[in-house]
Amino acid sequence: MWVGLGTPSDFNGRDVRGKLVLIQSMPMPGVVAHSAEYIDASQRAAEQGAAAVAFNVAIPGNYQVQTGPGNSRVPTFTLGSDDMTALREAMERGPVKVRVRLATEMRQGLRDASVWGVLPGTTNEDIVVMAHHDSYFYGAMDNASGMSVMLGLAEYFSKIPQSQRRRTLRFVTTSGHHAGSLGTAWLHDNRATALANTVLAINCEHVSVTQAYYDRNAPVLRKSDNIDARRWWVNGSGRLASIAQGAWKMFGVTTYDTMENNASGDMRAMDRDVPSVQLIESSVYYHTDHDVPDVVPDAGLEAVARGYAKIIDQVNTLEKAVLLPKAPQSSSSARP
């Protein structure tokens, strides 16, 4: 049964018990956020007795996507736009009976680990640069782009003599981001020791992707010759924010006009434990089978790597106290 967006009004007068419910979800801009999640459409279908749910995130083409079903508690599937259109048109011609089979596999004993690399400095203070190493599908943007920037920074700073590196640089490919950000959660839980001497943390995640647009005349996704703007985050003083924004501007790193309320992505688990900086963007290609190298511009990788290197160089001229955020004015402004 087709229920459109899956709002309460879409379900009015419809008996979905024992049926496959089809939901059309609007991308905002894609899998990272879409209307079915915002309005609990899958959960609503399950509560009203649906046997299964299939929804389409309306990205033109036939994208495979990875997205959570929410709290539907019934078998839930995603369909590409072409497949959903074919099924809907078949329903328009008459009743359609479907046979649904969900095949899953459980694997035991799998392990992952954060991998560390260290460039010693001349003091006991350090800067942590991180990038998660797990991905869905091909993972070019998410997160080979971040990994490449981190490795580029490691290569660049390795060519600077240790005697000229004020602070130790610790590089870490964090584990289990798509399973609860286990690597950064560990850093948060062990911050009293693992981050005791850390003056800055930088997260490299989804840093470069081709800007795309929905065509105004047809259901087509069109690539541009530009790079998507990035969401950004700074936990620290006004001086640190000025350094970060100045570095991004110097190297042409496009960003949103205002800062995020928190560091989304892998850094979220530890975003306020130490002064921190992040760029991240979750485009229409995010968590889809179209997240391939072709949509990751080299120029964007280079710009972000140069920006982060500039931030590190400037931070290394300052004491940690200069980088710290102001203390909360009252308990109401403290982190929950």
Regions found by a protein language model. Name each.
Residues 84, 122-124, 174-278:
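Metal-dependent peptidase/peptidase-like ectodomains
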Residues 284-336:
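His/Asp/Glu-rich mid-to-C-terminal helical/loop segments that flank catalytic regions of hydrolases
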Residues 11-16, 40-51, 67-70, 118, ...:
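Mature extracellular/periplasmic domains of secretome proteins
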Residues 2-13, 68-141, 152-155, 159-160, ...:
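Soluble metallo-hydrolase cores and metallopeptidase-like ectodomains found primarily
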Residues 2, 26-42, 72-77, 102-105, ...:
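Second-shell loop/turn segments in exported
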Residues 26-28, 59-60, 133-136, 172-179, ...:
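Acidic, glycine-rich active-site loops and adjacent beta-strand->loop/helix elements
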Residues 1-78, 155:
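Extracellular/luminal Protease-associated
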Residues 2, 19-24, 51-56, 76-78, ...:
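Structural recognition of the beta-strand scaffold that forms the well-ordered cores
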